[in-house]
Amino acid sequence: MTTVQAGLTYYKQLNEQIRAAQDSEITVENVIGQRYIGCGSTDRKITVHGTAGNGLGQYLNGSTIEVFGNAQEAVGDTMNAGEIVVHGNVGDACGYAMRGGKIYIKGDCGYRVGIHMKAYQQHFPVMVVGG
């Protein structure tokens, strides 16, 4: 398992470190709003501690992302497959245009959640909001 310290790392460098990791299990600690974590990821388990920025898991294609904290806007935008679990709240447009996969939110969501979700052939998107 690889552990990455986010801290004050700029989001582009943080995502390069995540993509470059050889392990399939990655833990990202001290996240303070870095964007696009796990975008387009396939066959990985990414654990996030902190507040994930915009676009968490956009275009996700089979990975699992678990956030111990909150996430900002556009979680799972255009997601194809995989799973996102947020043990907190998320901002606006969660699950926007998702085509498959599952999103579970423990807390509340902002506006326009699940807008343009669509099922196609064997892909059936699922979103559960606990707030």
What are these model-derived regions, one by one?
Residues 1-131:
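Long, distal/terminal scaffolding or interaction modules
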